[in-house]
């Protein structure tokens, strides 16, 4: 169970075998997320449920989000494509969101006019 976890570095689950609940509700991925070759044996992985989707950073190269599990895995991760304003296309699990970890700068206060 990875609910509410924050992966501030690369999250590499490639070739991992999951035999229990695998939940990523409200999990934040600041960098790469790699599930290539992962094997989900009994229970489908959950990345989103109602308002509790995982978050993926738009500052990461879209190619570094990999959700293609092992071809022999009985369960998989259902992806969707999301296009951002600059035209980049991200493939992330259905129901998840992209976010920008660098907040916009606060507006400067206006100089008083005389």
Residue ranges, per PLM feature:
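N-terminal leader/targeting and pre-domain segments
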Residues: 1-114
